[in-house]
Regions:
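Short, glycine-/small-residue-rich phosphate/pyrophosphate-handling segment
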Residues: 94-95, 109-154
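Cofactor-binding loop segments of dinucleotide-utilizing enzymes, especially the Rossmann-like FAD-
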Residues: 8, 40, 124-127, 157
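Intrinsically disordered, low-complexity linkers and flanking regions associated
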Residues: 236-253
Length: 256
């Protein structure tokens, strides 16, 4: 397993960095030694310009000349993406938000490296925003992972308790999560999205259902009818877990 760790906090020994380090210790305890780490605060990352050049041949990444293309190959190669960031003003700090906005080129990865083959871990700490700030951030990554067909795990810490180094239970949680990847295997993509023009493939109906829900909001009016038809079909199968059927029910009242 190849792991990419992106630490977004400007504090190298802060809560999210400490939790990320503990997670990696757990990962390495089961042989996950192939870890590439970047501290985003030390990189030069310009905001995305929305030019979509990255989505056009030759699909070589981002045209902006900064440090993004240093991280890009490691992101492509990684099986596990770990994002560690504090909550500032009800969402993730700008260092991570800037990077996430630059993730458009990741949509051009070949089938062996595409987003549905990866797993996402989000590690965060928050203080004054409790509970709403962390909820907004977690929901963002639930939506991203759901749409992209990625697995997701979240570790959150309320820093009003003090530094996490003094919280053995939370450190143990991060360590145990790292160890939990001992049996992780890259997903085999077997189910293709039925929506015209999408082209995404997923490991199973579970991931496809979440993709359809996350991509079928009111901002996607032109696609909604086609998506709803596909989701209705999926909602009638017993192959979905209760949690996914609950998510579907937010869009389709009769799908739960």
């Amino acid at each position: 397993m190849k792991t990419l760790l992106l630490k977004a906090s400007p504090r190298p020994d802060g809560n999210t960095a400490t939790l990320a380090n503990r997670f990696v210790e757990g990962l390495r305890s089961i042989g996950g030694d192939d870890v590439v780490e970047f501290r985003l605060n030390e990189l030069t990352l310009r905001p995305c310009q929305g030019c979509n050049a990255c989505l056009k041949p030759p699909y070589a990444g981002c045209v902006l000349e900064d440090d993004f293309m240093t991280v890009f190959p490691a992101f492509r190669a990684a099986d596990l993406i770990v994002l560690a960031a504090p909550i500032y003003w009800w969402h993730v700090c700008s260092q991570l938000k800037t990077f996430v906005d630059r993730m458009h080129p990741m949509l051009t990865f070949d089938r062996a490296h595409c987003l549905p083959t990866k797993h996402l871990v989000f590690i965060t700490a928050y203080f004054a925003e409790d509970p709403y700030g962390v909820g907004l951030a977690v929901k963002t990554f639930e939506s991203i992972a759901g749409w992209a067909g990625m697995g997701l795990d979240v570790v959150r810490y309320h820093s009003a308790k003090g530094h996490v180094r003094n919280d053995p239970d939370k450190l143990a949680e991060a360590y145990a999560l790292g160890r939990s990847f001992a049996d992780w295997r890259k997903p085999v993509l077997k189910v293709r999205c039925p929506v015209t023009g999408c082209g995404f493939a997923f490991a199973d109906l579970e991931r496809l259902a979440l993709h359809l829900v996350m991509a079928a909001g009111e901002d996607h009016l032109e696609w909604k009818a086609e998506y709803l038809s596909a989701v209705h079909t999926l909602s009638n199968t017993q192959a979905l877990t209760a949690e996914t059927r609950r998510v579907l029910s937010h869009l389709l009242p009769d799908a739960g």
